[in-house]
Amino acid sequence: MVSGCAIDEYSNIETGSVGEPLGVLGGSPSAEDVAQGRKFFGAGSYGLAEKHFRRAVEANPNSVSAWVGLAASYDQLKRYDLADKAYRRALSLHGRQPLLLNNYGYHYLLRGNKGAARKILREAERKAPDDPAIQHNLALLENWSYADNFDGVPEKPRKFDKR
């Protein structure tokens, strides 16, 4: 995936309690749910993806790939509050790695919070200055305007006339 939120980079990572990589997913109940979640996410079935990623984090709360997939699914479902919690959990497990920061910055871009998106994406850029996904998301941020807001998410809640 060139831009946006990438879940594939985390498909083979699980971590222990202090964040060290433990190896390739496989054979565990959470691994099957992560695989199914990735399949549904790729097909645009974000509700089903969320279901599988949620089951994966319940089975293995230390699975970075499950938390990232869950966060990305919540973003697509516009459940930004839950996505934020999932990203913070992934960050606590895996640290402030560039691709994870890229996803977290994109999350704030989707929310319409350009300030937070810029801060996090710039941190990702400092850690991986030549990463094309990070550069693409920074370009999206700089070229973003209220008029082309993704999926109509406003920066501030709109007040509707009650007539």
Cite the ranges covered by each PLM segment:
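Bacterial Sec signal peptide processing site at the extreme N-terminus
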Residues: V2-L25
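Structural marker of alpha-solenoid helical repeat scaffolds
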Residues: L25, A59, S92-H94, R126-K127
